[in-house]
Protein backbone atom coordinates (compact mmCIF):
# COMPACT_ATOMS: atom_id res chain seq x y z
CA UNK A 1 0.00 0.00 0.00
CA UNK A 2 2.86 2.41 0.80
CA UNK A 3 4.87 1.52 -2.32
CA UNK A 4 2.42 3.05 -4.83
CA UNK A 5 2.25 6.23 -2.76
CA UNK A 6 6.05 6.58 -2.67
CA UNK A 7 6.29 5.90 -6.40
CA UNK A 8 3.61 8.46 -7.22
CA UNK A 9 5.36 11.09 -5.07
CA UNK A 10 8.67 10.42 -6.82
CA UNK A 11 7.00 10.65 -10.22
CA UNK A 12 5.31 13.91 -9.23
CA UNK A 13 8.51 15.65 -8.13
CA UNK A 14 10.89 14.10 -10.69
CA UNK A 15 10.29 16.74 -13.39
CA UNK A 16 11.19 19.46 -10.90
CA UNK A 17 14.60 17.94 -10.21
CA UNK A 18 15.55 18.17 -13.89
CA UNK A 19 14.33 21.74 -14.37
CA UNK A 20 16.63 24.11 -16.18
CA UNK A 21 17.17 27.83 -15.94
CA UNK A 22 16.73 29.53 -19.30
CA UNK A 23 18.53 32.81 -19.94
CA UNK A 24 16.58 35.66 -21.52
CA UNK A 25 18.56 38.32 -23.33
CA UNK A 26 15.75 39.96 -25.29
CA UNK A 27 17.22 38.82 -28.59
CA UNK A 28 17.39 35.04 -28.94
CA UNK A 29 14.22 33.45 -27.49
CA UNK A 30 12.77 30.86 -29.87
CA UNK A 31 9.33 29.28 -29.99
CA UNK A 32 10.85 25.90 -29.11
CA UNK A 33 12.65 27.36 -26.09
CA UNK A 34 9.49 29.20 -25.04
CA UNK A 35 7.55 25.92 -25.12
CA UNK A 36 10.29 24.21 -23.06
CA UNK A 37 10.21 27.05 -20.50
CA UNK A 38 6.46 26.64 -20.09
CA UNK A 39 6.89 23.20 -18.51
CA UNK A 40 6.38 23.03 -14.74
CA UNK A 41 9.55 23.75 -12.78
CA UNK A 42 11.41 25.46 -15.62
CA UNK A 43 12.91 28.78 -14.58
CA UNK A 44 14.12 31.91 -16.33
CA UNK A 45 16.84 34.45 -15.61
CA UNK A 46 17.72 37.65 -17.41
CA UNK A 47 21.28 37.96 -18.70
CA UNK A 48 23.49 40.86 -17.57
CA UNK A 49 23.07 42.41 -21.04
CA UNK A 50 19.29 42.13 -20.68
CA UNK A 51 19.40 43.83 -17.27
CA UNK A 52 21.49 46.64 -18.75
CA UNK A 53 18.83 47.20 -21.44
CA UNK A 54 16.02 47.10 -18.84
CA UNK A 55 17.79 49.77 -16.77
CA UNK A 56 18.48 51.95 -19.83
CA UNK A 57 14.90 51.69 -21.10
CA UNK A 58 13.57 52.75 -17.69
CA UNK A 59 16.01 55.65 -17.46
CA UNK A 60 15.04 57.13 -20.86
CA UNK A 61 11.46 58.20 -20.01
CA UNK A 62 12.50 59.27 -16.50
CA UNK A 63 15.17 61.54 -18.00
CA UNK A 64 12.71 62.90 -20.56
CA UNK A 65 10.17 63.66 -17.82
CA UNK A 66 12.88 65.37 -15.78
CA UNK A 67 13.60 67.54 -18.84
CA UNK A 68 9.96 68.65 -18.75
CA UNK A 69 8.58 66.53 -21.60
CA UNK A 70 5.15 64.94 -21.28
CA UNK A 71 5.47 61.16 -21.13
CA UNK A 72 2.32 59.23 -21.99
CA UNK A 73 1.20 57.17 -18.98
CA UNK A 74 3.99 58.51 -16.76
CA UNK A 75 3.46 62.25 -16.41
CA UNK A 76 0.22 62.55 -18.41
CA UNK A 77 -2.94 60.45 -18.57
CA UNK A 78 -4.00 58.00 -21.32
CA UNK A 79 -6.33 58.26 -24.32
CA UNK A 80 -8.85 61.10 -24.36
CA UNK A 81 -7.39 62.32 -21.05
CA UNK A 82 -3.84 62.55 -22.41
CA UNK A 83 -3.72 66.31 -21.80
CA UNK A 84 -4.23 65.86 -18.04
CA UNK A 85 -1.11 65.86 -15.88
CA UNK A 86 -0.63 62.88 -13.57
CA UNK A 87 2.69 63.85 -12.03
CA UNK A 88 5.22 66.63 -12.25
CA UNK A 89 8.55 66.52 -14.05
CA UNK A 90 10.46 64.88 -11.22
CA UNK A 91 8.59 61.56 -11.29
CA UNK A 92 11.02 59.83 -8.94
CA UNK A 93 10.61 62.43 -6.16
CA UNK A 94 7.63 62.80 -3.84
CA UNK A 95 4.79 63.64 -4.17
CA UNK A 96 5.06 62.93 -7.91
CA UNK A 97 6.29 59.36 -7.44
CA UNK A 98 3.30 58.41 -5.29
CA UNK A 99 0.90 60.11 -7.72
CA UNK A 100 2.39 58.24 -10.69
CA UNK A 101 2.34 54.88 -8.86
CA UNK A 102 -1.26 55.38 -7.74
CA UNK A 103 -2.30 56.36 -11.27
CA UNK A 104 -0.65 53.30 -12.84
CA UNK A 105 -2.04 50.93 -10.18
CA UNK A 106 -5.51 52.26 -10.98
CA UNK A 107 -4.92 51.73 -14.70
CA UNK A 108 -3.79 48.13 -14.13
CA UNK A 109 -6.86 47.34 -12.06
CA UNK A 110 -9.13 48.81 -14.72
CA UNK A 111 -7.54 46.69 -17.46
CA UNK A 112 -6.77 43.49 -15.56
CA UNK A 113 -10.17 41.82 -15.39
CA UNK A 114 -9.99 38.04 -15.45
CA UNK A 115 -12.92 36.19 -16.95
CA UNK A 116 -13.35 32.46 -17.29
CA UNK A 117 -12.28 30.31 -18.96
CA UNK A 118 -8.78 31.05 -17.68
CA UNK A 119 -5.73 30.29 -19.76
CA UNK A 120 -3.85 27.08 -19.08
CA UNK A 121 -0.85 27.55 -16.73
CA UNK A 122 1.60 26.90 -19.57
CA UNK A 123 0.01 29.58 -21.76
CA UNK A 124 0.03 32.07 -18.88
CA UNK A 125 3.68 31.30 -18.16
CA UNK A 126 4.58 31.76 -21.83
CA UNK A 127 2.87 35.18 -21.86
CA UNK A 128 4.87 36.24 -18.80
CA UNK A 129 8.14 34.98 -20.34
CA UNK A 130 7.45 36.83 -23.60
CA UNK A 131 6.85 40.05 -21.68
CA UNK A 132 10.03 39.62 -19.61
CA UNK A 133 11.97 38.93 -22.81
CA UNK A 134 10.56 42.16 -24.29
CA UNK A 135 11.80 43.99 -21.20
CA UNK A 136 15.25 42.43 -21.68
CA UNK A 137 15.22 43.73 -25.27
CA UNK A 138 15.04 47.23 -23.81
CA UNK A 139 11.81 48.48 -25.36
CA UNK A 140 9.34 48.70 -22.48
CA UNK A 141 10.47 51.40 -20.06
CA UNK A 142 9.62 49.06 -17.16
CA UNK A 143 11.48 49.40 -13.89
CA UNK A 144 13.93 46.85 -12.57
CA UNK A 145 11.52 46.13 -9.71
CA UNK A 146 8.72 45.29 -12.16
CA UNK A 147 11.01 43.06 -14.20
CA UNK A 148 12.17 41.26 -11.04
CA UNK A 149 8.59 40.17 -10.33
CA UNK A 150 8.30 38.19 -13.57
CA UNK A 151 10.82 35.35 -12.96
CA UNK A 152 8.99 34.55 -9.72
CA UNK A 153 5.91 33.54 -11.70
Residue positions per predicted region:
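Conserved, well-structured ligand/cofactor-binding cores
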Residues: 20-153
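Sec-dependent N-terminal signal peptides
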Residues: 4-13
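N-terminal signal peptide c-region/cleavage motif recognized by signal peptidases
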Residues: 14-19
Amino acid sequence: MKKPLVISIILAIAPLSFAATHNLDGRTLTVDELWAISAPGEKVAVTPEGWARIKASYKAPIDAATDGRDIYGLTVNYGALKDQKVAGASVEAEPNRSASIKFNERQMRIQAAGLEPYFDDRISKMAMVIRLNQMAAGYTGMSEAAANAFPEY
